[in-house]
């Protein structure tokens, strides 16, 4: 299927909310990782989201260029073409973008999509993330207002983060002592500033103890009930029913999370979950095994010539793609999206 249109993306998110499941959002940095994501989604018969961080996009542009926008555009172009060969729907998203790089990433990408829409074409991306967790909440939401208006005009969904996700993402680190739990006051301020959809649809990355990176199970202290508290704040403020889920939540920093906590978060309106650390490991592990198992072949030692079949990048990149795709299927299972593609 072609990359999801804005209408299809909205339908995907609506179905996830109604069905109590979420889509894995897989961070990709190359054609190989994009292929792995598409393969995993297709084998799980799950729609999904492919996303590029600022660092991933810069990497995608090549060492000689190192340009976030050029890398994101190039990776998106590959994904648009590659997705046509698969029978599932996939949306393209850009991950964490902090204030200091907005002008180098999200703002120019929004402008590119607006130009496409003005020509009668579809936007290049279906959603973008603004990460204002490092600035005061009022400034965070003021910038969110600006970006949401631009996103709405280009038929794009905005993702907004309130609160701080611990750990490190693309070199940006949040200390454990930071505010890792979004407060009821911040939920209320969010509604006051950007509404609940009438000013443009947005996804909300509220924090409930999430931590980026790799941690042993049990070392991530999640409190999904924070998300329930956010929904309760919105219900009361908007006069909605007790079972309403007005916020579309995103789960960040889920590596090492207990399965039960993930399932609980789904009941509170999580419809997107970022997956990066686990798929990075899944991609790298078989490459390491290949190098150890073919040590004398991948290296030219003591005057020997090695084995071309062993050091041909295709020999180990195929294994990496397969392993990563299998880990993505596991994420689809965890998030209950298996077999629920809207393309059926």
Swiss-Prot record:
Q: EC?
A: 4.1.2.13
List the active site.
95 (proton donor)
The residues that the entry says bind D-glyceraldehyde 3-phosphate are 53
Q: Which GO terms describe its biological process?
A: glycolytic process
Molecular function GO labels: fructose-bisphosphate aldolase activity; zinc ion binding
Protein residues bound to Zn(2+) 2: 131, 161
The portions of this protein that span the membrane are none
Keyword Lyase assigned: yes
GO cellular component assignments: cytosol
Q: Answer whether the UniProt record assigns the keyword Coiled coil to this protein.
A: no
Give the reactions, separated by semicolons, that this protein catalyses. beta-D-fructose 1,6-bisphosphate = D-glyceraldehyde 3-phosphate + dihydroxyacetone phosphate
User: Which UniProt key words apply to this protein?
Assistant: Glycolysis, Lyase, Metal-binding, Zinc
**Residues given in the record as dihydroxyacetone phosphate binding sites:** 213, 253-255, 274-277
Q: How is the cofactor bound?
A: Binds 2 Zn(2+) ions per subunit. One is catalytic and the other provides a structural contribution.
Per UniProt, Zn(2+) 1 binds at 96, 212, 252
Q: Which family does it belong to?
A: Belongs to the class II fructose-bisphosphate aldolase family.
Official protein name in the record: Fructose-bisphosphate aldolase
Q: Which organism is it from?
A: Corynebacterium glutamicum (strain ATCC 13032 / DSM 20300 / JCM 1318 / BCRC 11384 / CCUG 27702 / LMG 3730 / NBRC 12168 / NCIMB 10025 / NRRL B-2784 / 534)
